[in-house]
Design a protein with these regions (language model features):
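Rhodanese-like catalytic fold shared by cysteine-dependent sulfurtransferases
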Residues: 2-25, 31-61, 70-102
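Short, surface-exposed ligand- or partner-binding patches at beta-edge/loop junctions that are enriched
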Residues: 65
């Protein structure tokens, strides 16, 4: 499926890829109040406003998501500018098929 800005990320395929990739980190870039309402199990919360605090090796596989995919796309661009080499935008949490953790 193609959106206004090209192909939409395949959330579930990228989540599976993250689970299979050694050392991968799934990051929910929404605000803490959004995160506690429900998030992908195993994900951590680093809001877009604090993405500059990411303290991983530059080659760590990072998988980002948010409510619509916009904030995660912005965070991905920031991390890439900071030299992170393996960052992927998973897109919107609404594409997640499973039980959310609270």
């Amino acid at each position: 499926m193609f959106g206004l800005f090209g192909k939409k990320p395949d959330f579930m395929a990228l989540l599976q890829e993250a689970k299979e990739k050694k050392g991968a980190v799934v990051i929910d870039v929404r605000e803490p109040d959004e995160y506690i309402q429900g998030h992908v199990p195993g994900s951590i919360n680093i809001p877009t406003s604090q993405i500059n605090t990411v303290n991983y090796e530059k080659d760590t596989p990072l998988y980002l998501y948010c409510l619509s995919g916009g904030r995660s796309k912005m965070a991905m661009g920031f991390l890439e500018q900071k030299g992170f080499q393996n960052v992927k935008n998973m897109g919107a949490i609404g594409q997640y098929r499973g039980e959310l953790e609270k």
